[in-house]
A protein has these predicted regions:
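Long insertion/accessory domains within large nucleic-acid-processing enzymes
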Residues: 1-128
Length: 128
């Protein structure tokens, strides 16, 4: 004997424009239950690149959810700390206070750099 299939379109459909973000990574939450974002995966990225839509790809992957700006020390290449009281940037490694470059990078990249620094691995950004 047969039973009715309970999968209905209204239970499956999901979309969103703006919604909750994960505090740690600053990226959209996962899943329909959490009103999460739709994943723009590797195959979708490769398809857009092959069609020559590089600005669209950068906008979806980087600008829409993950952009972050930092100041990088030109002497040692590490991300500089910012002092709110004195309104200055300071490199804690080489005590530099003047020679910095403004860099925009994904927040996930900055998070990975910080995790590597906790393991005593110093990734350096070379700016020219």
């Amino acid at each position: 004997f047969y039973q009715r299939l309970k999968h209905m379109v209204n239970d499956k459909q999901h979309s969103r424009s703006i919604g909750p973000m994960v505090n740690l990574t600053r990226q959209p939450a996962e899943g329909r239950a959490r009103d999460g974002g739709l994943r723009f995966g590797e195959m979708e990225r490769d398809c857009m690149i092959s069609h020559g839509a590089s600005r669209f790809t950068k906008g979806r992957i980087y600008d829409a959810s993950d952009t972050f700006s930092v100041h990088v020390c030109n002497k040692c290449g590490l991300i500089a700390a910012y002092n709110d009281v004195e309104n200055i940037h300071l490199c804690k490694t080489c005590e530099n206070r003047t020679d910095f470059s403004y860099v925009e990078l994904p927040y996930s990249c900055k998070l990975m750099f910080q995790e590597l620094l906790t393991m005593n691995i110093a990734p350096r950004l070379i700016t020219e």
